[in-house]
From Swiss-Prot:
Any one GO biological process: adenine catabolic process
Alphabetic keyword roster: Hydrolase, Manganese
UniProt GO MF annotations: adenine deaminase activity
Cofactor dependency: Mn(2+)
PANTHER family: ADENINE DEAMINASE, N-ACETYLGLUCOSAMINE-6-PHOSPHATE DEACETYLASE
The EC number(s) this enzyme carries: 3.5.4.2
Keyword Flavoprotein belongs to the record: no
Family of this protein: Belongs to the metallo-dependent hydrolases superfamily. Adenine deaminase family.
CDD domains: AdeC
Catalytic activities: adenine + H2O + H(+) = hypoxanthine + NH4(+)
SUPFAM superfamilies reported in the protein's UniProt record: Composite domain of metallo-dependent hydrolases, Metallo-dependent hydrolases
Protein name according to UniProt: Adenine deaminase
Membrane-crossing residue ranges in chain numbering: none
Amino acid sequence: MNNSINHKFHHISRAEYQELLAVSRGDAVADYIIDNVSILDLINAGEISGPIVIKGRYIAGVGAEYADTPALQRIDARGATAVPGFIDAHLHIESSMMTPVTFETATLPRGLTTVICDPHEIVNVMGEAGFAWFARCAEQARQNQYLQVSSCVPALEGCDVNGASFTLEQMLAWRDHPQVTGLAEMMDYPGVINGQNALLDKLDAFRYLTLDGHCPGLGGKELNAYIAAGIENCHESYQLEEGRRKLQLGMSLMIREGSAASNLNALAPLINEFNSPQCMLCTDDRNPWEIAHEGHIDALIRRLIEQHNVPLHVAYRVASWSTARHFGLNHLGLLAPGKQADIVLLSDARKVTVQQVLVKGEPIDAQTLQAEESARLALSAPPYGNTIARQPVSASDFALQFTPGKRYRVIDVIHNELITHSRSSVYSENGFDRDDVCFIAVLERYGQRLAPACGLLGGFGLNEGALAATVSHDSHNIVVIGRSAEEMALAVNQVIQDGGGLCVVRNGQVQSHLPLPIAGLMSTDTAQSLAEQIDALKAAARECGPLPDEPFIQMAFLSLPVIPALKLTSQGLFDGEKFAFTTLEVTE
């Protein structure tokens, strides 16, 4: 990371400097002092005793030498442990189905003071207007919401229909925005490796910022070439040796634990005292139900400590300081003089029990955040409007003809993983030779009037009914899986009627549905209401069979061509290892 860019994110006036230094010297009154607290030392391990002194947005000093410092207000930490605010190194807020405003309300009281967002979900639907809205939300947020400029819209050129483009010229207009930290995940890794000029132009344009990667399972010379292009990190690693090799070659490793992709158990054994500055935590995609019931980055820290015996200072280091350094946010990530006062007070550091949160030097009150949510959302001017340009469908739209004795490709799902396997199944007059095979279809929703792309899905666990959604990465067309064409059509028509959303159909009836009026991706409901609705959706989905833990999130990745091995886009069946379209019938 080029630390010469730190000035971009660390705005402090000369007057603020003078006031801060006066308090640091002991010549002026602090705004806040946190007493009766121990500070977890992320650098040396152990703890630092003594108060934390705050002036404005910044920490003026820490330690016993400030015990008698006067302050306008004192906070009794009651013996709590203080750690830096948590940082999510990579996520798509849209995948939480919450607006950035609602997301802040749900996660800031849990200690998540900083997020590095890639809003490419909404940018794929509505282009620069979606990015501009995210920037407006970030500008007014208490939470530090930083943005990586979406690099691959669509994820892979020529493989899917999406709603908008995001040109290099448009991207450059946002490069110097104070909330922008770099270039978001470069998903077209074959294009980068092969030196496609359009992709290298993007990397060159953002080279003085952070360049995010995306290269699941990549190794050998190809991985070397990808890193040689300037890519600095990857959040897609899912195997221990894969993660180790990326670290050896100089990449920073983002350890992901989301609602669908669960890589923490595989990668946590890599973390040690030596490489932890190169390791970070991220969620990528996490829904409101999990946030409400399990947590966010706090849940990942808890698992590192309890399940993987990671030392406290290392677990909290990878959740804050490592990420801050990687993105050049050197005013964040430590509880030290001159750093921004983003502080989490923990009544139990091992269990990550959050007692109180301060951000930019101010205590956070969850009830105040909730009370202000509606007004702040309105102030951001959300991009409302129906983005579903698709007429209702009928069962005949999903008709597939199979020949007995022929072999057909099946997208084989791995529960709680984003990768799939490519398998095959033989058709007979009695059906397929695997009883777990159901149907999948992707319907473009941007007015192109294409016929549905249809395929076969195995391993998902759907024994009856149908699920449909307008959340399908990254182009966010309509994806539907089902056992019958009639129920698939019913589910699709419900999400069309809702202007986007999620739906469960069983026994010929809609059992549960959730409208998502912003870009077919996000709701304007509160986090609690969303969590309750998702709970109802999941309960209805469970009646359809032994589905993945997060069926809609897992289903959303079945159309993402940049993650292997076999996916279905609006253009057809795509081989994510050969990076080429293939046929449903196996003819080789």
